């Protein structure tokens, strides 16, 4: 039997291990998924800011179809925890592309590659000269959440007034959005060539209510708190995540009941973390843990009582789905992509955005409710956001572009059943 033709995929990313953001996790998991399919060779171009990974997430395995090329990078001025390509990285990427001869190029984080980064779109010229697809993925609602950062207003205003986003994305054949909310954000920026494909997902097998055990929380809870109701936020501690809103809502909640604790699991820019700690210092039972990864993260998720995410600008909501798969009720805000799949009173709870009192009231309602049916529905619904399904959706689309498959599947949205 004739072996299948191997197609080479080139992924140009700024988020990749050892960075521990949700985007980095997905880029890593996606690269491995495609490399294991037997019909792709995967080449990832990622920042070189820390070559030796500090967690198992970044450890290479024996996957011969996965190649990781590191390009020269620097901290991105608007958000220095993110690393972006230096100007000279574009030439290195061009030479490597000529060597690997990809059949398709995918660039994520387009704005970060261009603005205050390489000042160009690496791979575009190669794609044009060799007549191959040049695809973008819209992972981060950068323009909306930049409103949360006082120092970013110039970037947001400049991008809108100059129509920079529309100009950049017109250089690309198609922009893939994971949700209708992300697609709408693109359209508001003048990005017309979009397609909605639910490509993001989690490893649902990692998360389970069977992990629930209060011992996993003993590191942070004192003896008086061990029987408390524990609220959890897990993710990046950035202004755009509106953790300040949650801290204020928790203070209001404690006026109604004192038997509750708040765990804030994550990290972020020093100035943001310090500001949040100052906000919380007079409120009892608030605990900052730093980033949690792997088994520890999954165990803590299942062992808390309510997951709270007040972020209004999610293009997917990775930690929300992880919490759903862990068997704890989710409270989030009625905004962004999360409200496309999390339905009030069906598989979770929605609070009004930017409303401290409203968020506190919803959390209080959850603590008073029997959430068994909601948790069961959330567990079922989380399965539709598996990593396998998301990557398969992408693979189906790639195969259309590569001419492998003539079958056209409806990947534009997930049905609400």
Predicted regions: what they are:
Residues 1-57, 64-70, 410, 415-417:
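N-terminal subdomain of nucleotide-sugar transferases
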Residues 12, 218-250:
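Conserved donor-binding/catalytic core segment of Leloir-type glycosyltransferases
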Residues 92, 208-224, 400-403, 407:
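A short helix/loop element that forms part of the nucleotide-sugar donor recognition site in Leloir-type
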Residues 157-216, 226:
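Donor nucleotide-sugar binding/catalytic pocket of nucleotide-sugar-dependent glycosyltransferases
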Residues 312:
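Aromatic "clamp/platform" in nucleotide-sugar-dependent glycosyltransferases that forms part
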């Amino acid at each position: 039997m004739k072996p299948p033709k191997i197609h080479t995929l080139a992924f140009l990313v700024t988020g990749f291990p050892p960075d521990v953001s949700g985007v980095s996790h997905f880029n890593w998991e996606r690269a491995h998924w495609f490399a294991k399919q037997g019909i792709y060779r995967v080449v990832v171009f990622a920042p070189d800011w820390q070559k030796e990974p500090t967690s198992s997430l970044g450890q290479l395995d024996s996957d011969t179809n996965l190649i990781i090329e590191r390009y020269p990078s620097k901290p991105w001025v608007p958000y220095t925890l993110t690393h972006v390509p230096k100007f000279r990285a574009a030439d290195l990427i061009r030479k490597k592309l000529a060597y690997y001869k990809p059949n398709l190029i995918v660039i994520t984080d387009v704005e970060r590659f261009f603005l205050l980064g390489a000042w160009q779109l690496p791979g575009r010229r190669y794609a044009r000269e060799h007549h191959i697809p040049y695809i973008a993925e819209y992972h981060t609602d950068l323009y909306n959440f930049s409103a949360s950062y006082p120092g970013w207003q110039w970037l947001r205003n400049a991008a809108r007034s100059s129509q920079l986003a529309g100009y950049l994305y017109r250089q690309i054949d198609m922009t893939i959005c994971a949700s209708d909310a992300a697609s709408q954000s693109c359209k508001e920026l003048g990005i017309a060539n979009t397609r909605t494909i639910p490509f993001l997902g989690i490893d649902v097998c990692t998360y389970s209510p069977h992990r629930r055990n209060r011992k996993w929380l003993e590191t942070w809870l004192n003896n008086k708190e061990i029987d408390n109701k524990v609220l959890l936020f897990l993710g990046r501690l950035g202004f755009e995540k509106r953790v300040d809103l949650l801290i204020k809502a928790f203070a209001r909640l404690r006026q109604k009941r004192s038997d509750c604790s708040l765990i804030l699991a994550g990290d972020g820019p020093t100035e943001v973390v310090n500001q949040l700690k100052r906000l919380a210092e007079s409120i009892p039972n608030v605990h900052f843990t730093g980033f949690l990864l792997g088994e520890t993260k999954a165990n803590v998720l299942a062992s808390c009582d309510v997951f709270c995410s007040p972020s209004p600008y999610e293009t997917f909501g990775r930690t929300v789905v992880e919490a759903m798969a862990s068997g704890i009720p989710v409270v989030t805000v009625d905004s962004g992509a999360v409200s496309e799949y999390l339905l009030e009173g069906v598989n979770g709870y929605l609070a009004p955005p930017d409303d401290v009192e409203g968020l506190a009231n919803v959390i209080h309602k959850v603590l008073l409710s029997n959430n068994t049916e909601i948790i069961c529905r959330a567990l079922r619904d989380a399965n539709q956001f598996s990593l396998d399904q998301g990557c398969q959706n992408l693979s189906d689309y790639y195969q259309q572009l590569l001419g492998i498959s003539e079958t056209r599947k409806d990947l534009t949205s997930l049905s609400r059943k």
